[in-house]
Amino acid sequence: AAAQKMIEDEVICLLSEGPAPFHPRYTAPNYKRLLEQGSAFMDLKPAENLYDATASLLTAYHYAPSGEPVFIGRLDDLLDPYVSRMPEEQALAVLKNFWLLVDRLFPNAFVHADIGPEATLAGRLLLRVDRELKTITNLTLRYDPSVTPVDFALQAVENALQLAKPYFLNHPLMVQDWGDDYI
């Protein structure tokens, strides 16, 4: 009865989805913690390499409490520690498989990832992979003119001219409004 009243008072919006069981729309798991500590619940060990890291992330995305993942993390920040420990071409191959799987496994979800504002090898490779594969997965560059290198920003601009992404986010304003850990 209380829930029905909240629906009638427009406190709760059903998003025109009908009488489906309630589940959160947007969740923000701590993916960094998952990679560093693993998950007893999902029987995942801490990631030791890029293969482990991408497998753990895909597993976590699959079991998102919202049914579909929405924000899949600051991927360059999450993956760079693993990318930087392997040959670039090998890392590129793993990232291609990962990005393709994200695109194919969650085609009907508004899935998005962030990179930047710092330039990392993982961020540069993800831009390269995205440009090559032309997937629909959303990608945003957290841009900060005092931090983001011009060549990294230009790589993102070249992608945007071909793919209409990455999107550019004013990182300093977001930090000002929401703090360093915004999503």
What spans do the regions from the language model cover?
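Conserved catalytic cores of very large enzyme subunits
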Residues: 1-183
